[in-house]
Amino acid sequence: MTQKDSPWLFRTYAGHSTAKASNALYRTNLAKGQTGLSVAFDLPTQTGYDSDDALARGEVGKVGVPICHLGDMRMLFDQIPLEQMNTSMTINATAPWLLALYIAVAEEQGADISKLQGTVQNDLMKEYLSRGTYICPPRPSLRMITDVAAYTRVHLPKWNPMNVCSYHLQEAGATPEQELAFALATGIAVLDDLRTKVPAEHFPAMVGRISFFVNAGIRFVTEMCKMRAFVDLWDEICRDRYGIEEEKYRRFRYGVQVNSLGLTEQQPENNVYRILIEMLAVTLSKKARARAVQLPAWNEALGLPRPWDQQWSLRMQQILAYESDLLEYEDLFDGNPAIERKVEALKDGAREELAHIEAMGGAIEAIDYMKARLVESNAERIARVETGETVVVGVNRWTSGAPSPLTTGDGAIMVADPEAERDQIARLEAWRAGRDGAAVAAALAELRRAATSGENVMPASIAAAKAGATTGEWAAELRRAFGEFRGPTGVARAPSNRTEGLDPIREAVQAVSARLGRPLKFVVGKPGLDGHSNGAEQIAARARDCGMDITYDGIRLTPAEIVAKAADERAHVLGLSILSGSHMPLVTEVLAEMRRAGLDVPLIVGGIIPEEDAAELRASGVAAVYTPKDFELNRIMMDIVGLVDRTALAAE
């Protein structure tokens, strides 16, 4: 019988509503053949807020599972033996805390924690650049990344303490060269800091524990070459910069989720083929094959996938690994001159970008530069789709077709339980009432001391977890110790002429502004905890290029703060971007704040919004609703001009 290589880990990124509901989902997925867990946490957990915090309103359990305390984590992994599991936790700013809770639960299960296997993402650099779930400034955040790494070296030697995460960089518009360079710059920043925390003889092994989490887009030949370039460049950095001699410690180890940015709301059944093609990029080449793969569901552009949708993506992996003969062969592309040329070109471009970052002082000093580059690259990507230079089937070519039977009936998505947030808050209140308050206070005081003294925060975090502290209490101590960070928006003040078709819009903006007696003022806001800022940035940048007076202050603002800003700026139109599924409660609150403030201007909303919700929003007073199918930004700009022309002129 032909010898086959072992397949990669099959993961499904999952978590929603409550710890109990997510536990049931995990156990079901494991029974279906999933070989590892990939935990999605909700936004309050990711950003260090308890479920009853004002900023958490409407966000609890929406994009992942809420974890407020040890009881939640205990429930999440009920009847799942952690010593036997390989668990990936997509968590960053609160990674030390979630790992502390995980360790505490494993110890309760009787596990030998030195045998625990898994990963915390723990990459704060990409949070500043794209994802937005940061808490503290870059320097103390870097310190906590390496605190986790130094702790796992001693106590969890099989644990990956960090995923250098280029996934979200591509989602934010990075070119392959930028994705390579920005991710490698992050890896360098982490290893430079980690080298000061571990004995020299143990440093090579720690380098070997750093893993990567990457993206794979539809241009799958280029993406495969990108992965081969990653392998070569990481080996080069480990050997030349850090003097790592053992080849096994220089190995580029990575997991992947294929691209979600390219999944379309229009003709969503086509996404199945996109996902399959993108998976080939990270599985075909043995030399650059992923260690773990998780695939999005075909309907992510519509809303929250159902268990069946996730099962379909899992089956895709299983068919490739077990029915095909892919794993019977050595690397299929070694010696291919076209592949080698492309790999070398990508490496040269990445080295040039990396040298520029290094000249600025490294990744932390280059955050503003990298953010601006991503916003520019994403604007160029969107412009290519708008003009048709980049073909997207069902979006800008071949847009007519028969209705899909997949999207009939229940709307093809899972709807969040509206009672889940109230239930979670009730359990949180019961947890607080039943714990030893003095023990919690003492544990938090010790955490504060460790944070301010420079000690590793992991032991104090584990003690706080066992004492009964909450996610919000843990994060509050770090905010007190290090302060809270406001990230760059990447939206430059100067307009750009890179986009076609702007002249008629600029003329319309100038005409309306002349009648108003001042420039058309457009305030863009991101309410709640949703850190996916790409859409808001692109709307703000395009409006700026069209001649509007733009205010965009970035992410994580309350409805009251956004409305106050719009009132202070005398906005003619207010726009909200919400991609977390929390559009209904957040928009309702913004409308109430607008009424209280006497702000009578059009409100427009963009996000992943089902049509029934969009209809309800319009009925409640929202002037326009935009979803991923509305990819033509110039048309949105003309809509805004028309709204202002009809409403604000009459008022003024």
From Swiss-Prot:
> Which protein is depicted?
Ethylmalonyl-CoA mutase
Molecular-function GO terms, alphabetical:
cobalamin binding; metal ion binding; methylmalonyl-CoA mutase activity
Could you tell me the EC number(s) of this protein? 5.4.99.63
Ordered alphabetically, the record's keywords are: Cobalamin, Cobalt, Isomerase, Metal-binding
Q: Which PROSITE patterns match?
A: B12_BINDING
Q: Which enzyme class?
A: isomerase
**Entry similarity comment:** Belongs to the methylmalonyl-CoA mutase family.
Q: Which Gene3D superfamilies match?
A: Cobalamin-binding domain, Methylmalonyl-CoA mutase
Q: What happens when the gene is disrupted?
A: Cells lacking this gene are able to grow with carbon substrates that do not require the operation of the (complete) ethylmalonyl-CoA pathway (succinate, propionate/HCO3(-), or acetate plus glyoxylate) but are unable to use acetate or acetoacetate as the sole carbon source. They show undetectable ethylmalonyl-CoA mutase activity when grown with acetate plus glyoxylate, while are still able to convert methylmalonyl-CoA to succinyl-CoA.
Provide the function of this protein. Radical enzyme that catalyzes the transformation of (2R)-ethylmalonyl-CoA to (2S)-methylsuccinyl-CoA. Is involved in the ethylmalonyl-CoA pathway for acetyl-CoA assimilation required for R.sphaeroides growth on acetate as sole carbon source. Is highly specific for its substrate, ethylmalonyl-CoA, and accepts methylmalonyl-CoA only at 0.2% relative activity.
Species of provenance:
Cereibacter sphaeroides (strain ATCC 17023 / DSM 158 / JCM 6121 / CCUG 31486 / LMG 2827 / NBRC 12203 / NCIMB 8253 / ATH 2.4.1.) (Rhodobacter sphaeroides)
Cofactor names from the entry are:
adenosylcob(III)alamin
Question: Which cysteines link up through disulfide bonds?
Answer: none
